[in-house]
Amino acid sequence: MDVENGEGQVQVHLKTKQEHYAVPDVPYAIDGTVTTVELNTFVNALLRQKDGSSDTDFDFLVFDEYLRGRLCDHLREKAISFEDAIEIEYVERFPAPEPQDCLLHDDWVSAVKASGKWILSGCYDNTLNLWTNKGKHILTISGHTAPIKAVDWISLDEETGRFVSTSQDQTAMLWQWNVGSNSVECVSVCKGHERGVDSVSVSPDGLRFATGSWDTMLKVWSAEVEDAVEGSSKRMKESGVRTPKITLQGHRESVSAVQWMDASTLLTGSWDHTLKVWDLSLEGIKTEISTNKSIFDASYSKLNRLILTASADKNLRLYDPRTNQGSVVRNTYLGHNAWVQTVMWSTTEEFLFVSGAYDNQNKLWDCRSPKAPLYDLLGHGEKVLDIDWSNPKYIVSGGVDNTVRVFKSRKALADDAETK
């Protein structure tokens, strides 16, 4: 029998970390041609024999990568001996996110961020908008004089929401929203960049935020409401103008992505084909990762400590900033058909992330499945410009079709099931 060509059988052990789905730990002989369909049938038959449980959809990992075709092809690609007993891990399949809402705007939606019950969006008509996560429009906010490029929440409770926005008008603006009266005021205008401000991220403690700009600079600012601007004139203080606490130079082109990795470390991505990790205590570069494409967006996961990039091609790439071979791509994710504009790790699911691209599509991925996404999240009619999964219950995205699309994730679907 030629097992490598799919003929004959392979010895496997079936393992799971979800104990209630465990099957007897004995070797099983299965055909080399099996796919996830046949493996699902087999595992569910074993579970029915064990406790009569109903069928569950599983995904299967072979040597830390999702099985996406025939087992024999997967083993051959990984150069795994067909004579050895193969360990196959199975996990309950992550359910498909469900479309919930389409939030209509007057112009391109270039920035979106969810927190609690609220969604904050930024548009090319220079306005910000506040929505409930159920799709009700709450407030339109004017102040910027050019298109919005990025937004982030600073803090949020039942009475007050604070957030920051950045714009092509070269400023960042700090806002305070009174939830009860539904009124908002601009607390500070942050001036210091010499070109449009493309990216923003608030520190974990909410006391600072960082911005990246087309002027190639990374700047760190105070996010505190009562902050006095040291060295500023009385007129600047009274007018609410704020200047940066730290300015860091190192990139050669636009700083298109910025994110706090911890209280004193920042990640940036740039059109100059590099990722940089900055140590704020030293005010310098800690690590630099060279890539071969302009970086449109980057996302760091506090759960797995890995970095994803969205670039000027169709691919997403995974990097490990902790290794000496930081510039070596750990994995490449294939699935989009145009430039990938935006990417974000899940904040609660270690292996999951979402992306949005110029092919009008969002995708939900597992980082162990490089050949294909878990799901396509369809709805946008034009390019996707930003995607957010800050609220574990909702995946939200904005695009050139003037909409924010809201998708319910597993946690929201579970809540819905409990209330029925």
Swiss-Prot record:
Subcellular compartments: Nucleus, Nucleolus; Nucleus, Nucleoplasm
Q: Which SMART domains match?
A: WD40
- Give positions of region: Ubiquitin-like (UBL) domain: 10-92
Q: Do you know which InterPro entries this protein is assigned to?
A: G-protein_beta_WD-40_rep, NLE, WD40/YVTN_repeat-like_dom_sf, WD40_repeat_CS, WD40_repeat_dom_sf, WD40_rpt, WDR12/Ytm1
Q: Start-end of the WD repeats?
A: 104-142, 143-185, 192-231, 250-288, 290-329, 335-375, 379-417
Predominantly, its location class is nucleus
Q: What does this protein do?
A: Required for maturation of ribosomal RNAs and formation of the large ribosomal subunit.
Q: Which family does it belong to?
A: Belongs to the WD repeat WDR12/YTM1 family.
Q: What is this protein called?
A: Ribosome biogenesis protein WDR12 homolog
> Which species is the source of this protein?
Drosophila yakuba (Fruit fly)
